[in-house]
Amino acid sequence: MDASTFLALTLACAPQVHADTAHALVSVESAFNPWAIGVVGGALQRQPRHRTEAIATATALHAAGRNFSVGLGQINVGNFSRLGLTLANAFEPCTN
């Protein structure tokens, strides 16, 4: 995701968060990749290249009982229920 797209996303989806703060967080957590998946205690051979692949990969990890985080902000699967997230909507940039 390019800088101008991310800035527009931040202003639209998280206006209460300063753009510099959101930029710093997402830069570290996902390198601005909305399909990023971080496996706790492991790694994927490669990151998903599109939304459908990201959801399929996350679904397989979840079925295998793995601990992982997803999306721009790298929200951990253990927090999904509390935040009202699903494997599908957690990859939506504005939701994440």
Model-derived segments and spans:
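Catalytic glycan-binding domains that act on GlcNAc-containing polysaccharides
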Residues: 1-96
